């Protein structure tokens, strides 16, 4: 072997028209490419060894190769494996993290932070933000959707250009944007001034004058744009995390371990909302203006109470920015990536439209290549089927994640806070467990692409059978005065106003349910005709109620007045809650067990160079067809079961107060089963259409085009033999 640069191979670094150069390659790298070339040439030459270490011709160690005459940093190969650090600073302590497990740890922390902010703190703070900044629900709904809008717009471009870039540095950028988004989201608190308490509202029958219709505007609602900006920044940070980060993990580990690592990473993004809800819930018990203190007579039960929603976003900002430095120190590829890729075999779906044979090694560097790359992906029928199956599943999962607490609250007569706690206790652990189990099973049995899709099909089938649990969870509505029950035989059905409360001028926009001693539920103390209350009792008690027929005294204390109603809903006679929660928990596990296998199948069925873009297309369509319309479809469906609407003094319809429980259960079953059937159909179609490549086909990782790499390596080998 002669020369000062060893074996030259332009396949490792795409040539540039301005500065054409050839990067050095070790003999082991040459042999890996040579083996791939023999496979691509139809096996005309016998294959010597799959392992570069077992070559019949001994290779000298890389340390014996002469040093390059090129300046430092100029001989970078496409596989830039190296130590952890920055430029020439590589502390030994950082090298312990320079492996897949070290990267996975930081990936999980960032995914956890993103989940805490986007799906935890934002959701639990929405109602507080509505009250503090006097916004309508339509505006806060747009705030929530801004994250998905940003993700959809950027996912394709980030995944396309980031595929050839330095993925860990992209994740450092993601950490910066997630932290910045959390910081911006908290800024309105610091610029809106001190929260001003209004007068307490007592909704008893005070024989007051009717409230006039008045509309007012507030400058506080202009902070809406700041919240939207924060969500857009969060979406910008989330895009590289779930596209480039997932592809980097898949690069760095063997095929059979990829599903395990991806499953663990995705499970952290699911546990994030749980932590966000717990953290946000605790912070909401603190008064909003922490530094100024609170009034001594103001408690959490007061309708005027607002919690310190903003503190959690500041904590997330600091934690996200603490991950910027760790991600920036990782090399472009972890040590050992080339050896791992050399041992992988291709599972790309084979047909005439997905060959992705581009003769230009610079393909993918220019925006002009973007339409061609997307068009190539869209022609991959297996990929499209898998994406459509995930969008259908995302529609139903996001719908249930949004409205499951409402379903539990109305079906079983629970408070909204307790219903939300039960919903989170079922959804989040079940989803995380399902993601991990799916990844573990695929990894343990070393499933190929087709078997992975079959596994996802089976888990979706089990989830379909369990979806009928909502039929058995249905509970009939209890008696409600003015809705399903008359006021002691007076008044009209469907009208909350009756002769017993006609002079009270009650507000229908103020829903404060109470249970009468007659077992009937009333809309509010005012509509029950109650004149007095005792607030030092838990729950609050009311008496002198003209609309309640006295039957049984709630209290047995002789010295106390005759209480006729207590605050809160009447207890339901439905006892199916434990069974429903148990079966639904199992349903969630099987639903999310298909998540990781489908992601792995998408990574396998597309060209190796298009994995990041494939994930970008998947997440874009998943949001456009799944997570964005999902809550809307569920919301419209649930609203169709409403029997009593909030109508204010201006005649404007607001939220729904009472639902038809039986109809709601049937409608949710219909949506769930329909989406599951669509998921199973496209999953099964992907299995039927999938055509694996010939056995032994290796993954082309080091160049855009295997043919170009093959010809170049053979020319270099011939040159060496002639010189030798």
Curated annotation (Swiss-Prot):
It catalyses: estrone 3-sulfate(out) = estrone 3-sulfate(in); L-thyroxine(out) = L-thyroxine(in); 3,3',5-triiodo-L-thyronine(out) = 3,3',5-triiodo-L-thyronine(in); chenodeoxycholate(out) = chenodeoxycholate(in). The modification Phosphoserine is found at residues 15-16, 24, 26, 28. The chain crosses the membrane at residues 102-122, 142-162, 169-193, 219-249, 270-290, 307-331, 377-398, 419-442, 447-470, 581-603, 613-638, 673-690. Predominantly expressed in kidney and lung but also weakly expressed in brain. Localizes primarily in the proximal straight tubules, the S3 fraction of the nephron. It is found in: Basolateral cell membrane; Apical cell membrane. This is Solute carrier organic anion transporter family member 4C1. Mediates the transport of organic anions such as steroids (estrone 3-sulfate, chenodeoxycholate, glycocholate) and thyroid hormones (3,3',5-triiodo-L-thyronine (T3), L-thyroxine (T4)), in the kidney. Capable of transporting cAMP and pharmacological substances such as digoxin, ouabain and methotrexate. Transport is independent of sodium, chloride ion, and ATP. Transport activity is stimulated by an acidic extracellular environment due to increased substrate affinity to the transporter. The driving force for this transport activity is currently not known. Residues 1-80 are annotated as: Disordered. GO terms for molecular function: organic anion transmembrane transporter activity; sodium-independent organic anion transmembrane transporter activity. It comes from the Eukaryota. It is a multi-pass membrane protein. Residues 25-46 have a biased composition (Polar residues). The modification Phosphothreonine is found at residue 19. Its main location: membrane. Keywords: Cell membrane, Developmental protein, Differentiation, Disulfide bond, Ion transport, Membrane, Phosphoprotein, Spermatogenesis, Transmembrane, Transmembrane helix, Transport. Residues 123-141, 194-218, 291-306, 399-418, 471-580, 639-672 are extracellular. The keyword Cell wall biogenesis/degradation does not apply. Residues 494-549 form the Kazal-like domain. Residues 1-101, 163-168, 250-269, 332-376, 443-446, 604-612, 691-724 are cytoplasmic. GO terms for biological process: cell differentiation; monoatomic ion transport; organic anion transport; sodium-independent organic anion transport; spermatogenesis.
